[in-house]
A protein has these predicted regions:
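Ribonuclease/tRNase effector modules and their secretory precursors
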Residues: 1-157
């Protein structure tokens, strides 16, 4: 693992109490993205705020939950544990262990930050004058990693 990658934030450290754990996750997210707004690619970082759920921004929910229907997303403990990783990977995107490329999908362009050593992907939407951290998640299967590496290789050529 890269030495700059923060440790996992585990639910057991909060007595397996979901409410306490959720508060700790949001506190870390707030420190990383609300307190000191990072610059990425020389541009300010904004957040996808809507839909706001339980007083928390959509970006936060995308970092800690999964599901294709926004209102039905469910917490994913592997995503939760890695709440500190999106900012760290964005801040260290020039590190050789982070494979970064831009990719068009429909009418949008996204940066993909693939930290293969940690099996973790961060997606940052390019909005011209600013960027939006869109989602971030662990890569669970080897075939997913192979696809990401193929996309990275396609970008490089």
């Amino acid at each position: 693992m890269p030495p700059w990658l923060p440790p996992l934030v585990q639910m057991a450290d909060y007595g397996n109490d979901w409410d306490e754990y959720l508060a700790a996750l949001y506190q870390r997210f707030s420190i990383d993205f609300l307190g000191a707004r990072p610059l990425f690619d020389g541009r300010p970082t904004q957040l996808k705020r809507h839909p706001v759920s339980e007083g928390k921004e959509a970006t936060f929910w995308h970092f800690i939950s999964d599901g294709s229907v926004e209102a039905d997303r469910l917490p994913n403990l592997r995503r939760c544990e890695r709440i500190a990783w999106p900012r760290a990977i964005m801040d260290n995107c020039a590190d050789p262990c982070v494979k970064m490329w831009r990719e068009a999908r429909g009418s949008s362009i996204n940066f993909h930050l693939w930290c293969e050593e940690a099996m973790y992907l961060v997606v940052v939407a390019d909005r011209g004058s600013f960027v939006l951290p869109w989602t971030a998640y662990p890569i669970e299967y080897e075939h997913q990693a192979r696809k990401l590496n193929a996309r990275w290789e396609k970008f490089r050529t």
